[in-house]
Amino acid sequence: MKFKADEISSIIKERIENFDLNLEIEETGKIISVADGVAKVYGLKNIMAGEMVEFENGDKGMALNLEESSVGIVILGKGEGLKEGASVKRLKKLLKVPVGEALIGRVVNALGEPIDAKGVVNANEYRFVEEKAKGIMARKSVHEPLHTGIKAIDALVPIGRGQRELIIGDRQTGKTTVAVDTIISQRGQGVICIYVAIGQKQSTVAQVVKRLEEHGAMEYTIVVNAGASDPAALQYLAPYAGVTMGEFFRDNAKHALIVYDDLSKHAVAYREMSLILRRPPGREAYPGDVFYLHSRLLERASKLNDELGAGSLTALPIIETQAGDVSAYIPTNVISITDGQIFLETDLFNSGIRPAINVGLSVSRVGGAAQIKATKQVSGTLRLDLAQYRELQAFTQFASDLDEASRKQLERGQRMVELLKQPPYSPLSVEKQVVLIFAGTKGFLDDIAVSRIKEFEDGIYPFIEAKHPDIFEQIRSKKALDSDLEEKLAKAINEFKANHL
């Protein structure tokens, strides 16, 4: 048998040309130690800060500490079955979460994975969890109102689209209720809402979701949950995942509202992670970058300029204080980052004034520009009236005889306090708020007993809707009160008082 040399060489050449060297090179490391949701890994020399890794058991991790001989990795999962010597491989990518319309109405974890047993989330787009906040030129000043449906807030501490307004108070003062009311109030306003629960009991989150479903609010709401039983790393990531989902709507010329409930637990989760990673502790054992932790999160809420679509992302962070101490580390940090705060007080809550908003300590630094003219007109003197009432109230504890003017002021104040009370989960439309506050500040309630203010409120809305529907319509369309409308309104209120009270 003869071999032809040129035949053999052509076959070899063909084999060489068609040879497919498909080698996948993976960089792996070994676990040195693992404890409390943090793994110390040796061998991942080229890893980036914030890079994702995969453990032997399929859990994902994120590199946070890059040291000379090892890498500190937080485990984004239960970490079951991980032991010393187990291998860890680099994924060469940063953490991304799903964004888009597919998430609306769903309950997801901090990685965007569904936890509501309603099947997979079919998202078309994924975005990086850590994004840089928009610069100055991309923004526009806050000028559109975001109505919360809560009388005391819309009149005295107005919130605008793109604002960051802190809700602060002790435990059990109604902070979550204010936030949930605001979400319910966005029905039909074209605002997508995101509720981020950080370190909450699962029963509490289930209750919030149930409330939102009852009021039809889950149709435009995404719930991101990192519960108390979840690893600290997931509690740390949850707000960033939530704001990434919100930014998608803002960047697509829509309006979004995000609630962080609450950032005190977020800071505690970050402190826990940092201490296990052996980062040096600072004040109250928080790490040195705890201010940056919250500032980089809250700066991502913004109102975009017209060239970028004029979308907005409004943030309502919640902070829980201990015994009303607003001067603690985390509260002062977040107060200085946000555009104002709504301060809720235990004493007011216990005395039946709910929502328990302390009008003196609550401010909105940029919301005034967003408030509609009608609300501004009727609530102009309201803050001053309430402040004078509080002062007089303290004074009357020592002095019994009051002059006529002081007595009138005291009585007006009592009625205004009663007027601003509101049951939970019953947000009011702007036109109804304007009518009610107009009645209070213009003295129409001065001759009605304090105990009958609620009766007046319950009756005036259906009365105007039935007999004078044009009043509500004009307030809605004009967004201001002219002399004709004021006259009509005064006439309607007097007519109602004469016939029904």
From Swiss-Prot:
Pfam family, one: ATP-synt_ab_C
One Gene Ontology MF term: ATP binding
Enzyme class per UniProt: translocase
Stored PROSITE patterns: ATPASE_ALPHA_BETA (PS00152)
Statement: the UniProt record of this protein carries the keyword Cell membrane: yes
Entry EC number(s): 7.1.2.2
Keywords: ATP synthesis, ATP-binding, Cell inner membrane, Cell membrane, CF(1), Hydrogen ion transport, Ion transport, Membrane, Nucleotide-binding, Translocase, Transport
Membrane topology type: Peripheral membrane protein
Gene3D superfamilies assigned: 2.40.30.20, ATP synthase alpha/beta chain, C-terminal domain, P-loop containing nucleotide triphosphate hydrolases
Binding, ATP: G169, D170, R171, Q172, T173, G174, K175, T176
Catalytic activity annotation: ATP + H2O + 4 H(+)(in) = ADP + phosphate + 5 H(+)(out)
Subcellular location: Cell inner membrane
Residues of the site described as Required for activity: S362
CC per GO annotation: plasma membrane; proton-transporting ATP synthase complex
CDD domains xref list: ATP-synt_F1_alpha_C, ATP-synt_F1_alpha_N, F1-ATPase_alpha_CD
Subunit structure: F-type ATPases have 2 components, CF(1) - the catalytic core - and CF(0) - the membrane proton channel. CF(1) has five subunits: alpha(3), beta(3), gamma(1), delta(1), epsilon(1). CF(0) has three main subunits: a(1), b(2) and c(9-12). The alpha and beta chains form an alternating ring which encloses part of the gamma chain. CF(1) is attached to CF(0) by a central stalk formed by the gamma and epsilon chains, while a peripheral stalk is formed by the delta and b chains.
NCBIfam families per the UniProt record, alphabetical: atpA, PRK13343.1
PANTHER family given in the database record: ATP SYNTHASE SUBUNIT ALPHA, MITOCHONDRIAL (PTHR48082:SF2)
Family: Belongs to the ATPase alpha/beta chains family.
Function of the protein: Produces ATP from ADP in the presence of a proton gradient across the membrane. The alpha chain is a regulatory subunit.
Protein name: ATP synthase subunit alpha
Gene it is expressed from: atpA
